[in-house]
Every structure is written in C-alpha cells, then in structure tokens.
C-alpha cells in the first residue's frame, strides 16, 4: 500500500513539474511574441500644428545637390489641433482628467493593477456590459498614438508592457502633457487646446472649473458626451467628474457646490475644414506614402499615422517638380479636347512622370478635370488594371535579351498557335498575320503571336521572376501565356508601378523604387524617415540600350508613330490595350523623363478610338515638359554596342539574295552585343528564276525566255488554309507549279 502511495506521489510530482515547466515555457513564448515597445518620439511635443512640404531646386538630382524650397500653397494643417505645454494648462483641467480617468495616476508605474484586475474579471464574466475600463492615462496615451484598440488579452498584455516602458523614459508631467494634447475630443478635434477654442472660444488657460470638467467628460465616449450634440449627457457626466474631484480632495465643498449646477456657455458651432483645402493629386499621394511608411516604421495603424501627420509638426521633403506638376494638371483640366470616346462620353485618365535616373515621382495626376476634394480615388497609384501589351518589353523581350535567348533580329513566325481544343490563339490586333518577322518589328507592331512564342522560349518561371525584379505585383495564377505575354494580369497593376519598371530601360538597366519624398523630419529637423535611393540592376547597359532602340521603333514606325514628340527629341515607348479595349496605355520616355498614361472607365467599358488617347495625352504632357530643355540630347549608346544590317526574314546578316526579294531590299539595321549577334549570312533567301508573267518558279529556266531572277524564302509552315499569312506568296513552296 505504501509502495503504491509513493508511486502515486511521484506521478503527481512529475505531473506538477511538467505543468509548471509547460506554463513557464508558454509564458516565455507569449512574452517573446508581444510587441512591448512604443517609439518615444511619437509621444513628444510638436511645436507646430502645420506640416510643411518642401521641394528641391536641384542642380544635380542624381547626386541630390540642390536647395529645399517650401511649397507654401501645399502646407498641411488641422485647425482643430494645437499643442499646449503642461505649464499652460490650468490645474483644474489636469485634476479633472486625472480624477475621472486615472485617480492613481501619480502613484502607479504605468499600470493600475487594481483596475486591471477588475477589468480582467469583467472581461471574463461580463459583469458590466458597457466595457472593461482598466486603462490608465499612460495606457490611453499609447492607444491614442498607436491606434491599437483591440480588446484582446494579447493586446492588453502588450499595452501593459508598453506603458511600463514609457514610464521608464518619461515623467508624469510629460505623459500627461502628451495625453492631453492627443486625446480625441469629438468634432474632429484633438487635444484640450483645440477643444477649448472649439467649445468655449477660449484659450485653455482661461477655462473655468466647470468647463474643465466638461472637457474631461468627453473622453470616455466622445460621440455620447459631445457638448454640442448631447449637452444633457455631458452635463450628467461632468457632475460625476466634479464629484470625483471632491472625493479625491482636488476641490473643496464650496467649489463643488458652486460648480455642480453651473451651466456652461458654448460657442457657436462652426463647421470648419479640417485641412488647408483641396490637396493636389501629388500632395495626396505624398501624404499617403508618408503615412504608410510612418505606420510601418513606428508600428502604428495607418489611420493613426495619418492623424499624426495631419495634426502637424512635421516637414516633408518631397521630390515633386512643381513646373511639371502644373503642366500635367493643365493638360488634364482640358481633357475634353483630347479623349472624347466615339460614343460621345469621356473616360477617366491618369499620368505619372518619373526621373529615369532616380525614379523620383516628378508629377502625378489621378483623374481628369479639376480636383474638387480630398481622399478621392487616385487612378495613378490605386487603380489596378490589366496593362495589355505594355508588359511585353518587361516580361518577354528584355528577358530574352538579357538571358541570351534571342536578340534584336531573331525571327519568329507570326502565325497563331493551335490549342488543345483545336482553336487558334492568340489573335492579333488588327486581325492579321504577317508571317516571318524579326523581334524588333514584332514589338513595334505589338504582334501577339510572336510575344507568346517568344515567351515560350523564355519560359514562364523566368518571365515571372523578371517581372518581380521590375517591381510588378503578381499572382501565382499569372504564370500563364495570357498574363505574361499579353498583359492580362489577374489583379492588374498600377500605372505608377508599370511606369517605374520602364525606368530600367531609360536608366541603363538599373532602377530604384519610385518615391514621392526623400525625408520626413520633425519640427526640430530630426530625421524620422529616410527613403532608400539604392538601385538594383536588372539588365546590362547594352541590353537596356537595345530595348530602348526597339521601343524607339514603336514611336518612329509602329503603333505610336503618330506621336509628334519624336520630331523634337528621341522618344521611345510602348502602347498597350487590354482585352475588349477596356484600357488604353502608353508608357514612354526621352533622355529626360519617363511618362506613363492610362485611359479607361472606372467601370471597365470598351473604348473606341482611331488613335490611342493615352498617346495623345502623353504627347501633350511631354511637349510641355520639354520646354526649355536641350532637345539635341539623345539616348546614350554604350561603347560595346554593335550596329549591323540584318535580313528581315531570317534575322541573319544581309546577303546578296536579300536584296532580290520581290518586295524590295529586306535589310534592316539592328543593335547587338558581341556575344549575342548574327554571324552568318542569310540562308533563307534562295535565288530562283520565275515566270515574269505569273511569278511561278521555272523548273527549266534555260528553255523559257519570259523569265526574271528573284529571291524567295525557303520556309515551310503548317497552318489551316482559312488563315491568310501575308508573306505566303513569297515562299518557294507557294510558287511551285502544281
């Protein structure tokens, strides 16, 4: 019996030890997973209620040499935010908030354990359905700054550790000052300084005891205790505040009796704009970028970051070019002259201008017409639309060049592919098939069949990986011909990202991420965020130049040949159209700028134009952008580039037979590198004698006087008879007599 008891005791002991170890391990795991810190800089005083925006008057943008100039018209401010020193706040106000929100504020180290215990019991057993109410002023300050209001055990534990850490670095006066300046006071108002002006039209230092109690009443539920909208609720709550102040010996019986039934006189409610007015498209994108980066770096919610930035006290050093922004806006104000659809309606449009060497966003317009509000849908950065053929240089042509799979003159057969179900795909736009064409020509005329065939040489994985290097957002479903060769991306892509990717072509194969600003500083000049200027190389300088020459062909002789800018300065670019003609794109560049334009309806609807409207807008914008610049500037050709004449139909070096083609000389000039160029003469053109009357090949030309020498193509293809291939008449097989 004793032996059994000993064994049983050992089992219990071992079980307890295991449970204790498990509990400790679990506690350590939970502790390690908690975010226990909050950036102290977020809690410190902001001397200004204005966030200023600067631009740079660069003499050398690439090396960041230039002076910062304030954009006074773009200053950001909230009229209902005003930082007040703790020494400017009346004692009654400080006492009122402490009495009702955290009566042991001056005694605890960030956490009131008694209130926390009560709140925990309430959370577990729901004694009070109205809430849990265990947060100290320090904890509330952290919630106000981080925006983390989740009611979960994990969030509460994080809040506790954060509060204790804050109290290690800040004194009680600093904490109370920060809290009273950031706490939400209803009506879009933050802090007691702005609240005193709003509700009583007074400086906070002039507030009476009952007015102080009224402000302290708002905090628990701003919408419920708003003095303007719910004066009776506020009155009942401020009586409770005064009673707490009496019980905590912050006021005497006489003060309490005088104040308990005293009415407050509210100022007339004025509907104010919370900002300086309507921001430009650029400024709004800038604010969005700064807030996103701020939220990420300082671990706060995006809406909290936005509140902090809009409340003021920061300096943003933007990368805008005010002249270009103004010129782009002028074009979009006059949009009706450029983009009327054939059905008489006007679609939407957006544009982005980048510096190719730095990827600085110089100008940005998110919609047509005059911008009439804030937080509007910005189509330049937020619209995700299928890019169509604009993607081909990124996903196919540049990949094949860089990997040495093909070159400028590599020839593909422009014929449709037969799919498993017997259908022919893809179709070209317009619906024609030209036959043998070199890559440069296929890109100039946006030939879909060649893009798909070239992609299959490159491989889906390689194409997908390169697009990610370019910064294009992809879905696993995009590993298919339609997405990678024809631009029908599952989730679409933004104009900004597509335009940014083209910087790699314009900048010798390297690019950095597009950015609207360089620095965010506080009002004392301390840098809070610094944007990365680091470049990544995607293509060699030589292949980037070859891509530029191919894209220059698009503007000189291809789908964008009606662009007039090319007559003034070297211009390269690519058109794009999504399925059903629902999106029209053009991304182009000169030695100075990269500009992307998108046109379409917010709800995808077919577009009907004889000329791509995005090309027209690009032309108008870039014509204005280049005023005053040296237009003789050209794309810089690397020393290693070789220029050679090649045969259009074979991609090989031009031979004598290439000049006897019935269509005339088939020689084109191409751009190559030493290790990726044609080295043999054309062997596809064969010299034959044909009947001068009907053009058929003569088997025995010595016996036939009506003859002429010509070069025909030795090439065999298998396509359905109903498909007309334009170069079929120039194949040897088609000229043989039956």
Predicted segments, located by residue:
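Low-complexity, Gly/Ser/Thr/Pro-rich intrinsically disordered linker/tail segments
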Residues: 644-738
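Active-site SXXK
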Residues: 95-98, 245, 328, 359, ...
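Short, well-structured active-site flanking segments
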Residues: 106-116, 190-193, 252-255, 377, ...
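Short active-site loop at a secondary-structure junction
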Residues: 81-86, 347-348, 373-394, 408-411, ...
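Juxtamembrane regions of bacterial inner-membrane/periplasmic proteins
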Residues: 2-333, 337, 361-362
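Conserved catalytic neighborhood of penicillin-recognizing serine enzymes
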Residues: 125-151, 272-275, 406-463, 522-553
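Mid-domain, small-residue-enriched loop/turn segments at the edges of structured enzyme/sensor domains
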Residues: 424-428, 459-500, 513
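A penicillin-recognizing enzyme superfamily signal
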Residues: 15, 318-341, 351-353, 364, ...
């Amino acid at each position: 019996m004793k032996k059994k008891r000993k064994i049983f005791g050992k089992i219990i002991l071992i079980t307890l030890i295991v449970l204790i170890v498990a509990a400790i391990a679990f506690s350590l795991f939970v502790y390690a997973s908690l975010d226990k810190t909050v950036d102290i800089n977020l809690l410190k005083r902001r001397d200004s209620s204005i966030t200023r925006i600067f631009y740079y008057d660069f003499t050398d943008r690439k090396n960041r040499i230039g002076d910062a100039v304030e954009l006074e018209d773009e200053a950001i401010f909230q009229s209902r935010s005003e930082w007040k020193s703790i020494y400017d706040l009346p004692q009654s106000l400080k006492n009122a908030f402490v009495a009702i929100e955290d009566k042991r504020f001056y005694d605890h180290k960030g956490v009131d354990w008694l209130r926390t215990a009560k709140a925990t019991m309430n959370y577990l057993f729901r004694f009070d359905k109205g809430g849990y109410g265990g947060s100290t002023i320090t904890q509330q300050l952290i919630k106000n700054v981080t925006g983390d209001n989740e009611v979960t055990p994990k969030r509460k534990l994080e809040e506790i550790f954060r509060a204790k850490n804050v109290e290690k670095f800040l004194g009680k006066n600093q904490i109370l000052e920060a809290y009273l300046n950031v706490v939400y006071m209803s009506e879009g108002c933050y802090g007691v300084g702005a609240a005193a002006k709003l509700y009583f039209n007074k400086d906070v230092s002039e507030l009476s005891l009952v007015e102080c109690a009224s402000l302290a009443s708002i905090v628990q539920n701003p919408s419920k205790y708003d003095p303007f909208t719910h004066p009776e609720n506020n009155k009942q709550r401020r009586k409770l505040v005064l009673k707490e102040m009496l019980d905590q010996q912050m006021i005497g019986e006489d003060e309490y009796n005088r104040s308990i039934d005293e009415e407050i006189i509210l100022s007339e409610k004025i509907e104010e704009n919370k900002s300086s007015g309507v921001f430009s498209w650029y400024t709004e994108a800038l604010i969005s970028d700064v807030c996103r980066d701020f939220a990420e770096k300082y671990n706060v919610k995006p809406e909290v970051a936005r509140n902090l930035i809009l409340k003021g006290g920061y300096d943003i050093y933007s990368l805008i070019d005010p002249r270009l922004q103004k010129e782009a806006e002028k074009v979009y104000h006059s949009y009706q002259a450029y983009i009327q659809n054939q059905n008489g309606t006007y679609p939407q449009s957006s544009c982005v201008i980048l510096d190719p060497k730095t990827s600085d966003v110089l100008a940005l317009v998110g919609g047509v017409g005059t911008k009439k509000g804030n937080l509007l849908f910005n189509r330049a950065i937020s619209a995700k639309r299928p890019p169509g053929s604009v993607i081909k240089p990124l996903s196919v042509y540049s990949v094949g060049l860089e990997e040495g799979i093909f070159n400028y003159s590599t020839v593909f057969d422009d014929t449709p592919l037969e799919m498993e179900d017997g259908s022919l795909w893809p179709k070209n736009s317009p619906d024609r098939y030209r036959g043998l064409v070199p890559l440069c020509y296929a890109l100039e005329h946006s030939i879909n069949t060649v893009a798909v065939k070239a992609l299959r040489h490159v491989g889906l994985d390689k194409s997908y990986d390169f697009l990610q290097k370019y910064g294009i957002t992809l879905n696993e479903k995009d590993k298919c011909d339609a997405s990678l060769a024809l631009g029908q991306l599952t989730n679409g892509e933004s104009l900004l990202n597509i335009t940014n990717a083209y910087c790699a072509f314009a900048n010798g194969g390297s690019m950095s991420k597009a950015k609207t600003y360089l620095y965010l500083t506080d009002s004392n000049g301390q840098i809070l965020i610094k944007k990365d200027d680091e470049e990544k190389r995607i293509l060699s300088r030589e292949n980037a130049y070859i891509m530029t020459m191919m894209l220059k062909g698009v503007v000189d002789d291809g789908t964008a040949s009606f662009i007039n800018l090319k007559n003034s300065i070297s211009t390269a670019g690519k058109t794009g159209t999504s399925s059903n003609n629902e999106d029209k794109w053009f991304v182009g560049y000169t030695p100075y700028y990269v500009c992307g334009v998108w046109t379409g309806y917010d709800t995808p609807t077919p577009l009907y134009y004889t000329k791509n409207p995005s090309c027209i807008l690009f032309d108008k914008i870039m014509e204005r952008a280049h005023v005053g610049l040296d237009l003789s500037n050209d794309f810089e050709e690397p020393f290693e580039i070789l220029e050679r004449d090649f045969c259009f139909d074979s991609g090989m070096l031009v031979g004598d037979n290439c000049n006897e083609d019935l269509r005339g000389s088939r020689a084109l000039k191409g751009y190559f590198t030493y290790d990726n160029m044609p080295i043999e003469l054309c062997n596809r053109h064969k010299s034959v004698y044909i009947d001068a009357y009907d053009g058929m090949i003569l088997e025995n030309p010595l016996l036939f006087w009506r003859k002429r020498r010509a070069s025909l193509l030795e090439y065999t293809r298998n396509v359905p008879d109903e498909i007309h291939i334009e170069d079929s008449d120039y194949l040897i097989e088609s000229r043989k007599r039956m």
